Amino acid sequence: MAIPESANKTSILLESGTNELEIIEFTVADETFGINVAKVREIMVAQAVKPMPNSHHVVEGVFKPRDEIITVISLAKYLGLPECENSGRDIFVVTHFNNLSFAFHVHTVVGIDRISWTAIKKPDKAVYGGQDGAATGIAEFQGRLITILDFEKIIAEISPESSIQVEAIEKMGERHTMEKTILVAEDSMLLSKLIIECLHKAGYKNTIKTDNGQEAWDYLLEAKESGDPIKDHVACIVSDIEMPLMDGHRLTKLVKEDLVLKKIPLILFSSLISEEMRIKGKQLGADEQISKPEIGKLVSLIDKLTENH
């Protein structure tokens, strides 16, 4: 079934920067997980797939529900959890982000929960694998804990060519070192590392890494309160949209409503940049919006927006 429009109010919530989202809650081997509704295109009963030779061990194969061939990923295998004994009732969660479609094989779908990003906490690195962890947040909802998985990291591991490529910066040719400081807000450990690496290679050696919108906002407030010209602290902000504690839309709203901070160019760099999301970002004041993994285009936009800073 497609995600009902009446159920998917994420667009309404994000339009005003209310810092809320809706997640689809699902289970794998009785463990509870979540994914942002905005990433999900359809939920359907699991069906037969065509195995692909020499594919990643968590790839079950491909199927063609309509006019598109979609790769199916076993979340049980990826997470090291047992397969369901009664697989006839399993579910495919069909996603679309980063301009790519994948189906994630799960065991049950519980429902759709509306939740505030403030209720989603950063996972403990010691428990969830540090730099290699598969979780971006832990949500508490109605007395139960839901693990928000880093689906972008999962896809990047299975299909590295679909993720951010450092080679894209090398193709831009020789570049000079810039003194300007770039503030990055990104909750995925893997993507944050890749973005910073690419910015450094592009000549932006001064970067500030934050794991979510709240950390970025706290830094901006400190910079503002210092009394120094704000451009001495931050020349440009690059922010994801999906982040625990405070999302990128809420961060954009706060920055662009502040008389001092609104002068800082802000780029939304997210896997969720659809036409609908682009309208919302523009309404909230984002200077530019670009879909992952177009890192070369991101660097070009930073160049353009910081020309006079």
Can you say where each PLM-predicted feature lies in the sequence?
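An acidic, low-aromatic, low-complexity terminal/linker signal
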Residues: M1-I237, I241-H249, K262, S271-H309
